[in-house]
């Protein structure tokens, strides 16, 4: 395991988050380990909406000290877990209810 400090800033806003990253034998990057607080906040956001807009992804990343890519991948993985847990009950209608529509972006 490599341990370090991830200091990311935006304008005058800075957040500092401790992280753990494991590396595989061939030097490739392995799993990201999220803190309990990060996981809790991500789960709360997922409970509110299974799909997150780019703007919201940016906001979450800033507040948790993670990259937007990490947020995007966490949500992709969490949706797959949700799909497995709900089995055949997961229909396209249910997924479309959670996915933002164009009207959400246009403001109609």
UniProtKB/Swiss-Prot annotation:
Residues annotated to bind DNA: 27-86
Protein name (record): Homeobox protein HB3
Annotated family: Belongs to the Antp homeobox family.
SMART domains attached to this UniProt entry: HOX (SM00389)
PANTHER family given in the database record: HOMEOBOX PROTEIN ABDOMINAL-A (PTHR45659:SF4), HOMEOBOX PROTEIN HOX (PTHR45659)
Main location: nucleus
Organism ancestry: Eukaryota, Metazoa, Echinodermata, Eleutherozoa, Echinozoa
Any single Pfam family the record assigns to this protein: Homeodomain
InterPro entries: Antp_homeobox, HD, HD_metazoa, Homeobox_CS, Homeodomain-like_sf, HTH_motif
GO MF annotations in UniProt: DNA-binding transcription factor activity, RNA polymerase II-specific; RNA polymerase II cis-regulatory region sequence-specific DNA binding
Any Gene Ontology CC annotation: nucleus
Keywords: Developmental protein, DNA-binding, Homeobox, Nucleus
Parts of the chain that traverse the membrane: none
GO biological process assignments: anterior/posterior pattern specification
Gene3D superfamilies: Homeodomain-like
Cellular compartment(s): Nucleus
């Amino acid at each position: 395991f490599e341990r370090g400090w991830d200091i990311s800033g935006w304008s005058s806003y800075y957040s500092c988050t401790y992280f753990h990253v494991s590396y595989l034998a061939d030097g490739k990057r392995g799993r990201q380990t999220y803190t309990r607080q990060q996981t809790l906040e991500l789960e709360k956001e997922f409970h509110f909406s299974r799909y997150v807009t780019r703007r919201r992804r940016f906001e979450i990343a800033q507040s948790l000290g993670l990259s937007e890519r990490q947020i995007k991948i966490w949500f992709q993985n969490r949706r797959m877990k949700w799909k497995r847990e709900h089995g055949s009950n997961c229909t396209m209608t249910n997924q479309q209810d959670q996915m933002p529509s164009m009207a959400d972006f246009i403001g109609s």
